């Protein structure tokens, strides 16, 4: 079962796969925020999540007015200003064969600069695809200094990171390590030959060191 619900006043968005749920808050004129991502919720559970005193995180934080943490998007406008302040301009829900796509339209409060944050939830597998679409109508070029395809906060705890690295004749070596405070960067500059070095694919184990047959993971 896959469904999406929307509260016309608050624009709450609930996307589900067979065993997971993603809940977003997208109030018109406000900030797009994550409310919940985890095991599948019923509609009653979803209402309880919105009412619970939980910490909500920005779903696509930008460099600008208030940016104490890492940003997903940073630009230099045509006039040299580096500030972004995005607000929800609207939402669109698209139903296609076997999937529901939610498009949350963000616009800057000052500049003609917009971002569509997109989520596509599938009905037959536990996959929620996410990407962004960036556009502007400024008079000159805008420089994109950072433009991540997605941003997902993970609750602090006994979280482990699994990734692959390698070299010629020694590809696909698995490394598993606890996720510590700070920044972990996995980078590959080898184009289509990325099996020879670090792989961009990662897996987060949310309840301790990864086990073969059980555990909660995000990959």
Model-predicted regions and their roles:
Residues 1-11:
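Bacterial Sec-dependent N-terminal signal peptides
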Residues 11-23, 32-219:
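Polysaccharide-binding surfaces and accessory modules of carbohydrate-active proteins
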């Amino acid at each position: 079962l896959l469904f999406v619900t929307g509260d016309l006043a608050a624009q709450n968005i609930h996307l589900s796969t067979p065993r997971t749920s993603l809940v977003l808050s997208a109030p018109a004129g406000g900030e797009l925020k994550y409310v919940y991502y985890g095991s599948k919720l019923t509609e009653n559970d979803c209402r309880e999540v919105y009412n619970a005193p939980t910490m909500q995180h920005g779903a696509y934080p930008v460099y600008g007015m208030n940016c104490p943490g890492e940003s997903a998007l940073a630009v230099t406008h045509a006039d040299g200003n580096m500030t972004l302040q995005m607000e929800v301009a609207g939402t669109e829900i698209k139903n296609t064969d076997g999937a529901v796509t939610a498009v949350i339209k963000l616009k800057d409060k000052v500049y003609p600069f917009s971002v569509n944050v997109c989520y596509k939830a599938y009905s037959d597998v536990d996959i929620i695809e996410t990407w962004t679409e960036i556009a502007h109508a400024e008079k000159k070029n805008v420089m994109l200094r950072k433009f991540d395809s997605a941003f997902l906060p993970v609750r602090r705890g006994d979280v482990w990171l699994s990734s692959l690295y390698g070299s010629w004749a020694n590809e696909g070596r698995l490394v598993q390590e606890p996720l510590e405070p700070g920044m972990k960067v996995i980078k590959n500059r080898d184009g289509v030959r990325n099996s020879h070095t670090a792989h961009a694919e990662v897996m987060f184990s949310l309840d301790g060191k990864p086990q073969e047959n059980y555990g909660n993971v995000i990959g």
